């Protein structure tokens, strides 16, 4: 059986995924990769960027795709599937130390610069929780790029516990939830995360005036929730596509003196998410908060970035295509 390793790799100007297959056929032609999400009418092709022979193995670089779904990599007449994958790697992860402290599982990038430094807290989205301290980094590759772009910052990326059944409830139209209990970005877990940051401030490692928070989807909701868990800790927040519930909507409308910039889109898997975000930002602006901003991407703008917005795609097909 061939040894298959899988990596998340930043290439020139784009981010993709790479396979390394030992004892694969020497023939480099006819290499294809397709996804087969449950319920999909037909397999979805994924672009193969390059195929090279290196050190007795094939190196195959592709566009990004949801590697946790069902995929088939074909090299001539040979097929390889997710079930045969032996190893998952994240290029660039080595700069992040794996830590578990005071009930919080997290990755931490430490800058070489001395003295109190800024800190950026990143909260992952739904489906990327667990206890391996790698899934949230592999799925949200931006964490690696943060360390490259903001090399003078501390970058903290905790992983929340997760259970099946949380996401469907979270994605119900404007569902009521306060994320209590041990799962997701609950107030209790966020409090423990913030305690670690305050400990780093007390130790002189972090500049108390330059602590920032961002997150995507469930992590975007966690970003808003973190702003209310420890008032005054964060200098600014950037929630990306934050999940909207009555609780997070109330928090958003109450951030009258906070600096925040929300990014979201009309095309979303949660019904009317953007409507409540727009209402919340407009309420803040009407209340005099000129530091509350919103970027709302249109389908045309998303398409310009290569993001599939075809309304005929099923939800799972759209996720896989992106």
State the predicted function of each range:
Residues 1-119, 280:
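A domain-start/cap signature at the N-terminus of enzymes
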Residues 261-322:
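C-terminal catalytic histidine-bearing segment of alpha/beta-hydrolase fold enzymes
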Residues 201-254:
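Primarily recognizes the serine-hydrolase "nucleophile elbow" in alpha/beta-hydrolase
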Residues 119, 126-190:
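Active-site machinery of serine-nucleophile hydrolases
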Residues 121-123, 240:
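Alpha/beta-hydrolase
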Residues 115, 169-217:
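Gly/Ser-rich "nucleophile elbow"/oxyanion-hole loop immediately N-terminal to the catalytic nucleophile
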Residues 123-125, 264-265:
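The conserved beta1-alpha1 loop
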Residues 151, 254-260:
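Short, proline-enriched alpha-helix->beta-strand connector loops that line the catalytic pocket
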């Amino acid at each position: 059986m061939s040894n298959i390793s899988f990596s998340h790799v930043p290439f020139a100007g784009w981010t993709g995924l790479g396979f390394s297959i030992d004892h694969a056929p020497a023939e480099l032609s006819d290499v294809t990769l397709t996804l087969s999400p449950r319920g999909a009418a037909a397999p979805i092709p994924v672009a193969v960027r390059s195929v090279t022979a290196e050190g007795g193995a094939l190196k195959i670089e592709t566009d990004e795709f949801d590697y946790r779904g069902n995929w088939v990599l074909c090299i001539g007449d040979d097929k390889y599937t997710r079930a045969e994958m032996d190893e998952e790697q994240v290029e660039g992860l080595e700069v992040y130390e794996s830590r578990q402290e005071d009930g919080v599982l997290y990755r931490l990038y430490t800058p070489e610069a001395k003295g109190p430094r800024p800190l950026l807290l990143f909260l992952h989205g739904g489906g990327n929780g667990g206890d391996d301290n790698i899934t949230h980094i592999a799925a949200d590759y931006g964490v690696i790029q943060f360390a490259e772009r903001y090399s003078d910052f501390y970058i903290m990326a905790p992983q929340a516990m997760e259970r099946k059944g949380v996401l469907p409830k979270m994605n119900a139209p404007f569902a009521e939830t306060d994320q209590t209990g041990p799962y997701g970005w609950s107030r209790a877990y966020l409090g423990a995360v913030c305690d670690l940051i305050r400990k780093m401030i007390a130790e002189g490692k972090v500049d108390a005036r330059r602590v920032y928070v961002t997150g995507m989807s469930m992590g975007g909701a966690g970003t808003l929730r973190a702003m209310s868990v420890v008032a005054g800790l964060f200098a600014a927040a950037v929630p990306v596509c934050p999940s909207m519930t009555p609780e997070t909507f109330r928090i958003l409308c109450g951030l009258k003196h906070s600096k925040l910039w929300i990014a979201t889109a009309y095309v979303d898997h949660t019904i009317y998410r953007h409507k409540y975000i727009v209402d919340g930002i407009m309420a803040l602006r009407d209340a005099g908060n000129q530091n509350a901003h919103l970027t709302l991407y249109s389908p045309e703008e998303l398409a310009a970035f290569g993001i599939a917005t075809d309304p005929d795609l099923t939800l799972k097909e759209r996720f896989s295509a992106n």
